[in-house]
Amino acid sequence: GSTGPSSINPVNNRPYGSVFPNITIRDIVRAQAKVADYLGINKWHAIIGGSMGGMQVLEWGAMFPERAPRIAPVATSLAASAQQIAWSAVGRAAIALDPRWRDGNYYESDPGDGPHAGLATARAIAQIHYRSDASFQSRFGRDLVDKDSLFGLWDRFEVESYLDYHGEKLIRRFDANSY
């Protein structure tokens, strides 16, 4: 994004961290519209987006119907459901329980010394609820990473490897304060 929790707070010349102001989908769309204005784009041919991007698509349609005559929201809703709010709360709790969270003020720590374990756990939780049980069963079943293993205490299942992969991928590109 254009700015976020790692941006410098002009009040104290340090990263905002956990005191970064809350923003809404409407705020994001207003900012996008200003960028479009700056670029001289008065009307989009179509706007498409999935998940949180889909919420932005819906907001474009509500706020600027004349600028967004065709919208295609994918895998989204007008607002988060109670269940989605609950899943998000559990993910944020996983981040906050990481000892390297430091109340969201970890930007001045050594590189790589942020709440990566908590963020990876939050991502694993999210990945589980993004798919159905049938989808997990079809893709992974009970397959082990090491096919020659005898189901020992520390053997790893393919599904665990999948969750680890997505957690590692997220911590390389995402700020835990933005979760």
Language model: regions and residue ranges:
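Hydrophobic, aromatic-rich cap/lid helix
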Residues: G167-Y179
